[in-house]
């Protein structure tokens, strides 16, 4: 009876430890991503405000197109930051299993990695527009090109830093899950024995 009681107590304590740790990992992921969305939303608001003021007041056609494109990018970045931030706040109340925690972590890492590749494409597109705009003396292509270069550069830096932060969180999570292979899904308790 003592052995059975000891095993049950160990399972319960292990489960509580694992759940608190999983909650901590989820909070770290949500906090990291939320902070990133605040930065992205702030960048978007800055571009919206400066673009809305400078676009109609620019005397140079190239500058007008630059600020017009920045205003559009600002709206997209602000909207993305705001909607993602709101979605993350709903996740704070959710109870994640170990499998769900790992899935969410992998998903956010993949999002920032793919965005990084897209940012390189934005920079290439902006550079192309600027070069072609210079050779054709096209203010619209030069203005749009410079804006896309600026936005792509910022987003590459942003997504790169976010990927690095999230990848670090993911590495800690994967290490934790390898060391503590006790699982609980609300109905069943499982122990994995490595042989």
Model regions: which residues?
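Helical transmembrane-bundle signal
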Residues: 44-54, 74-84, 122-126, 152-162
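Long, highly hydrophobic alpha-helical transmembrane signal-anchor segments
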Residues: 40-66
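Loop-to-helix transition at the N-terminal end of transmembrane alpha-helices
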Residues: 61-77
